[in-house]
Amino acid sequence: MSVEITFVEQFQEILQNGKEQIILLNFYAPWAAPCKQMNQVFDQFAKDTKNAVFLKIEAEKFSDIAESFDVNAVPLFVLIHGAKVLARISGANPQKLKAAIDEYIQPLISQISSTNASVETQVNSVQTTNTTSNTSKAPNGLDSELNERLSTLTNAHNVMLFLKGTPSEPACGFSRKLVGLLREQNVQYGFFNILADDSVRQGLKVFSDWPTFPQLYIKGEFVGGLDIVSEMIENGELQEMLPN
C-alpha cells in the first residue's frame, strides 16, 4: 500500500531507514484532475508491488521536499534507491510509470531477494563489470577523480555546507532554514553551491549516501541535512562537534 506523507520528519525518517529499499515518490496536487487519476493508479501499483515503498507527497504542502527533488510540475514520480535517482516520470502516464516499475523495481527486488546467489556468480559479475570499464572506481562506485574531488571539497573548511544557491541567496527552503540555523549558532563555515556543478550535486548523493540537500560536513565527515542538524542543535550535539 502507499503511504501519505503528513509531516517532514516522517519523510526524512523513511529515507534514513530505507536506504536499502526501493522508494517511489508521487508528488501531486489534490486539486489537479490528472493527479487524482494517477493517485488511483499509484495506489494500485503499490498494492501489486512487494518490497518497495510508495510515498505520496502533496507538493504545495511540502514545498521544501518538492524543491529538493526539483519538482516543477505535478504529477511527478521519482524512483530512488539509496542515494541514487533511478527515474523521473512526469505527467499522467500510467504506461510510463508501469514501465519504470518493471525496469527498475522488479530487477532490484529480485537482486535484493536472491540471498541464495552463489559466490561464483557474484565474482563473475564483478569480473565482467571490471573488464568492461576502463574508468577507475572508488569503493563507493564513484569515478575515482570525482571521489577525490568531493573529498577535497568536503575538507575545504572545518565546516562545509553544500546547498542550493548561496547563504545570501538560498535557492530552496531547506537551504534557507539551515543557513539561518547556522547563523543563529554563530557557526563559521565554507559553502558550495551545488546548482553550479551537477557532477558535484549528483556525486555527493552517493558520497554521503543521502539523496537531498542541503548537506553539512564537519571535518570532512557527513553530519546530515536540515532535520538532523536541527535535532543536533536542540540536544547540544552540534556544538560539541564544532572545532574550537
Swiss-Prot record:
Binding positions for glutathione per the UniProt entry: K164, R201, Q202, G203, L204, K205, L226, D227
Classification via InterPro entries: Glutaredoxin (IPR002109), GRX_PICOT-like (IPR033658), Monothiol_GRX-rel (IPR004480), Thioredoxin-like_sf (IPR036249), Thioredoxin_domain (IPR013766)
Subcellular location per the Swiss-Prot or TrEMBL entry: Cytoplasm; Nucleus
Keyword flag Iron: yes
Domain Glutaredoxin residue range list: 147-244
Domain Thioredoxin: 2-106
SUPFAM superfamilies reported in the protein's UniProt record: Thioredoxin-like (SSF52833)
GO BP field: intracellular iron ion homeostasis; positive regulation of transcription by RNA polymerase II
GO molecular function: 2 iron, 2 sulfur cluster binding; glutathione disulfide oxidoreductase activity; metal ion binding; protein sequestering activity
GO CC annotation terms, alphabetical: cytoplasm; cytosol; nucleus
Amino acids binding [2Fe-2S] cluster: C172
Annotated Pfam families: Glutaredoxin (PF00462), Thioredoxin (PF00085)
Keywords for this protein: 2Fe-2S, Cytoplasm, Iron, Iron-sulfur, Metal-binding, Nucleus, Redox-active center
Matching PANTHER family: GLUTAREDOXIN FAMILY MEMBER (PTHR10293), GLUTAREDOXIN-3 (PTHR10293:SF73)
Family named by the database record: Belongs to the glutaredoxin family. Monothiol subfamily.
Subunit structure: Homodimer. Interacts with php4.
Function: Monothiol glutaredoxin involved in the biogenesis of iron-sulfur clusters. Binds one iron-sulfur cluster per dimer. The iron-sulfur cluster is bound between subunits, and is complexed by a bound glutathione and a cysteine residue from each subunit.
Protein name as annotated: Monothiol glutaredoxin-4
